[in-house]
């Protein structure tokens, strides 16, 4: 059973304590009403994992845990089997006592692109919206964050996060809540808010930007990473039924248009930090994610186009500040 009591106790003692006015009731409702049909199977996989305290833990350069003496073949097989019960693994990679989870996305590459542009994370309280399995939460802790909170309603991601946490010695510096941002009150409590790979899934992208702003303290920093297209500040792609085989893609602006959106929502010091094309080396099928991936979503005769004929995915990182 995945519990959230440790998080409640933690925030009761800090500037997030006002969140306790709504959060426990929301989580209780989720536990009663909204659990996925496979959730018990997934949570059992987490429960059956061994409790291990790492001898060496690296969250600065990767997410890697090692034991002082190698685990037995039986222990490794048990961990490997239980983690494979939580497939597909999309965001990573993780290296846990000799079990290497080669995820669909090289999320470490994204982190390497983003990190040089951030304000120092040391001592910060961070919110990561749409955090997936929580890979970047651990990297935020490795970069010095005091507390990293992720929200993502996908319940498999919650179980993946809790599995990794257990194998990292039940580390309580990062937490994942099975919520969407629309369920959060205007906390105005986070020093840095990340939204990476979310905006294009929102029917109302400007509303999403306002929601992100409502989570930041004054002078707080927003890190926004999303799909973009080439063009000027008036360029926005509105795909038809699908984009790269995804149904739930609504608006893909140019980076200059996105900068304008952020300014319209009241952010200041907005800058385009990075723009890069997503490659089939960064997003691909692996033995931990065996279904279709980026290579299957591109036109086989013209890799600069999706199968629908749109520009192939490229992603931008924008940094902005709440006044």
From Swiss-Prot:
Keywords: Transferase, tRNA processing
Gene3D superfamilies with a match to the protein in the record: Vaccinia Virus protein VP39
A Pfam family annotated for this UniProt entry: Methyltransf_9
Catalytically driven reaction(s): carboxy-S-adenosyl-L-methionine + 5-hydroxyuridine(34) in tRNA = 5-carboxymethoxyuridine(34) in tRNA + S-adenosyl-L-homocysteine + H(+)
Enzyme Commission numbers on file: 2.5.1.-
Top-level class of the enzyme under EC nomenclature: transferase
Gene Ontology molecular-function annotations: methyltransferase activity; transferase activity, transferring alkyl or aryl (other than methyl) groups
CDD domains linked: AdoMet_MTases
Keyword Chaperone annotated: no
Binding of carboxy-S-adenosyl-L-methionine, residues: 91, 105, 110, 130, 152-154, 181-182, 196, 200, 315
Top-level division of the source organism's lineage: Bacteria
Annotated GO biological process: tRNA wobble uridine modification
NCBIfam families given in the database record: PRK15068.1 (NF011650), tRNA 5-methoxyuridine(34)/uridine 5-oxyacetic acid(34) synthase CmoB (TIGR00452)
Function recorded in the entry: Catalyzes carboxymethyl transfer from carboxy-S-adenosyl-L-methionine (Cx-SAM) to 5-hydroxyuridine (ho5U) to form 5-carboxymethoxyuridine (cmo5U) at position 34 in tRNAs.
Protein family per UniProt: Belongs to the class I-like SAM-binding methyltransferase superfamily. CmoB family.
Oligomer and partners: Homotetramer.
Stated name of the protein: tRNA U34 carboxymethyltransferase
Species this chain originates from: Salmonella schwarzengrund (strain CVM19633)
């Amino acid at each position: 059973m995945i519990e959230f009591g440790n998080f409640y106790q933690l925030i009761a003692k800090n500037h997030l304590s006002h969140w306790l006015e709504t959060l426990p009731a929301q989580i209780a409702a989720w536990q009663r009403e909204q659990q996925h049909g496979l959730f018990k199977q997934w949570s059992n996989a987490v429960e059956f994992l061994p409790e291990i305290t790492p001898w060496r833990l690296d969250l600065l350069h990767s997410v890697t845990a090692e034991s002082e003496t190698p685990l037995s073949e039986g222990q490794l097989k048990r961990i490997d089997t239980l983690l494979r019960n939580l497939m597909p693994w999309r965001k990573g990679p993780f290296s846990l006592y000799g079990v290497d989870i080669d995820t669909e996305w090289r999320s470490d590459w994204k982190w390497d692109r983003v990190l040089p542009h951030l304000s120092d994370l040391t001592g910060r309280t961070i919110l990561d919206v749409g955090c997936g399995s929580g890979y970047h939460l651990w990297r935020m802790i490795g970069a010095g964050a005091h507390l990293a909170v992720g929200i993502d309603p996908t319940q498999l991601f919650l179980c993946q996060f809790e599995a990794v946490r257990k194998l990292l010695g039940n580390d309580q510096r990062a937490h994942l809540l099975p919520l969407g941002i629309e369920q959060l009150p205007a906390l105005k409590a986070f020093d840095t808010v990340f939204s990476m790979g979310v905006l294009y899934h929102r029917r109302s992208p400007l509303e999403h930007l306002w929601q992100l702003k409502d989570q930041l303290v004054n002078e707080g920093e927003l890190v926004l990473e999303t799909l973009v297209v080439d063009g000027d500040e008036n360029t926005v792609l509105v795909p038809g039924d699908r984009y790269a085989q995804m149904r739930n893609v609504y608006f893909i602006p140019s980076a200059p248009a996105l900068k304008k959106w952020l300014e319209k929502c009241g952010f200041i010091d907005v800058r385009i930090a990075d723009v890069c094309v997503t490659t089939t080396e960064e997003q691909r099928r692996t033995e931990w994610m065996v279904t279709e991936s980026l290579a299957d979503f591109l036109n086989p005769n013209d890799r600069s186009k999706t199968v629908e004929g749109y520009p192939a995915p490229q992603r931008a990182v924008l940094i902005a500040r709440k006044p």
